[in-house]
Amino acid sequence: MSDPKIRTPIVCVMGHVDHGKTSLLDRIRGSSVVASEAGAITQHIGATIVPIEAIRKMSGSMEKIPINIPGLLFIDTPGHHAFTTLRARGGALADMAILVVDISQGFQPQTIEALQILRNCKTPFVIAATKVDRIHGWRINKDESFLSSFGKQNERVKTDIETKTYEIVGKLSDLGFSADRYDRVSDFQRNLAIVPVSAHTGEGIADLLMIMIGLAQRYMGEELKLSAEGPGEGTVLEVKEERGLGTTLDVILYNGTLSVGDEIAMASQDDVVTTKVRSLLKPRPMKEILIEDRFERVKSVVAASGIKVSAPGLEKVIAGSPLFVTRGNMDELAARIRKEMQEIHVNLAEEGIVIKADTIGALEALCKELESKEIKVMRAQVGPVSRHDLIDTETIKNPTFRVLLSFNTPILPDAADMIKDPLYTQVKVFSGQVIYQLIDQYVAWRDEQKRIAEKAQFEHVMMPAKIRLLPDCVFRQSNPAVVGVRVLGGKLRADVDLVKTDGKKIGHLKTMQLRQESIKEADAGLEVAISIEGATVGRQLNVGDDLLVDLPERHVKVLEREMLKNLNISTQEVLAEFVAIRRKAEPFWGK
């Protein structure tokens, strides 16, 4: 019998996109939710209870070992690039974690970010080296332990597995973690265990679960005992309408006990809301709480559980809110909830884009990811996109910030009508259900807008250029002088004034020709014929002379302050030469 005072340990599964987190959980629970999620990536936290009986059944070697924990509750954190507060909350919520790494691809940026989260949260974890069945030449032994299956492989495959495992060991060492393959680890507190597995064939899954149970049992007994008693504490995963029940909450209870009739407090769109639990619906073991299924009604639940709560007045509860059972300490809990919700607020800038999302976790996910890409956010809110949101966004001065990102949240009809109007161009709206795709769309649009703006700026700003008069290419001496020149650097355009390298004015370059065709501009390296008004060859200029475009001071300021990084090296050098000539006479010219 499981000790009723010991709660189910919470396990979170983290890792790089497409490394097989959801597939691994699918294998463990025997269901398949991969295809139902947007972009085949899990966007909201789901929870699955895997009872100890199921784990014993999978791992024959555990049948005789006394186990006093009731099973494992898995949280499947979002599987895309945004390792965010939703994940950090997943990390903090979890007692243990499985970090999924594709054995062939090794560590990716998100893997390292997941490691940092687990380190920050001080969460013990195991590495699941997935997709061993993809190793060339691997012979499948369905549902066997890794060591049993490994023993049946040929030497080349064994060597390949060893090499790939030690590449992971090496990378972990670089990041400050001591690790080895699980069967070579004697002290699981000091060393990370790497368990090679295949979600597709089930190989190694039993070993992984055995290690997780062992870790929980050996190192977390006291912590798990203490958490099962007292008033319940949890996190609201989702606020949902259920037929026959009205508005319900999907909750992860991570501490204490929750019973029918308990008064509970949560954050709502207005402030803190309290209500009494009408009914508790517990998912049947081995089912994912986010998949529609029958629930069993229970009178009370003990942490850790994924539970559905039915109660009056839940309509405005915010997904991601903490949930507390009150015991006459309402003021204290309300203050705690308000503090926690304030901490959720993201870093907002004076100027930036506007974002809307369906849950706090999603909002944070979006904000954190935008922050990592140095995209500023001016306003971040939970809820649908309204006409008012668009009107507010219109006031943003920078056109590349006059943008609204809508993640997984509806656009209300009045706003949709505005967006559909082909004449409405004031605000650019991006909406989607996969965070990284949404951000990629915005970044692509923003970069294109910048490119268009830069092109327009280049066309309006006079560009630096340096030319040299070529021998045997004087076609006319004056009125206007027509000569052949080579462009030594920069970008030469027609209709500009020219000066010598000592700053002396020469005349006005009126037109240019290349192979007897009129052109507007010429890049470095080209040889062209130019007409110069106000100059006479043999008097003001001679063959072999170098000339520079005489740039107005206001154009130099724009070039140096706004466009310098977009100028090629030769253009930058010509600009520097011209500015140095002008500053000999006027030290602060162009500054």
Swiss-Prot record:
Keyword annotations for this protein?
A: GTP-binding, Initiation factor, Nucleotide-binding, Protein biosynthesis
Q: What's the name of the protein?
A: Probable translation initiation factor IF-2
The record's region (G1) falls at 15-22
NCBIfam families in the record = aIF-2, PRK04004.1, small_GTP
Native organism is Methanoregula boonei (strain DSM 21154 / JCM 14090 / 6A8)
Tell me the residue numbers annotated for binding GTP.
15-22, 76-80, 130-133
In this chain the tr-type G domain maps to 6-220
Question: What InterPro entries does this protein's entry cite?
Answer: EFTU-type, P-loop_NTPase, Small_GTP-bd, T_Tr_GTP-bd_dom, TF_aIF-2_arc, TIF_IF2, TIF_IF2_dom3, TIF_IF2_dom3_sf
* Molecular function (Gene Ontology), one example: translation initiation factor activity
Its function, per the record, reads: Function in general translation initiation by promoting the binding of the formylmethionine-tRNA to ribosomes. Seems to function along with eIF-2.
User: Which ranges does the record mark as transmembrane?
Assistant: none
According to the record, the residues making up region (G2) are 40-44
Matching Pfam families, A to Z? GTP_EFTU, GTP_EFTU_D4, IF-2
Region (G3) residue spans: 76-79
Reply yes or no: does the keyword Aminoacyl-tRNA synthetase apply.
Answer: no
Q: Does the keyword Protease apply?
A: no
* Region G5, residue ranges: 198-200
- For region G4, the annotated ranges are 130-133
One annotated Gene Ontology cellular component of this protein: cytoplasm
Q: In which family does this protein belong, per the annotation?
A: Belongs to the TRAFAC class translation factor GTPase superfamily. Classic translation factor GTPase family. IF-2 subfamily.
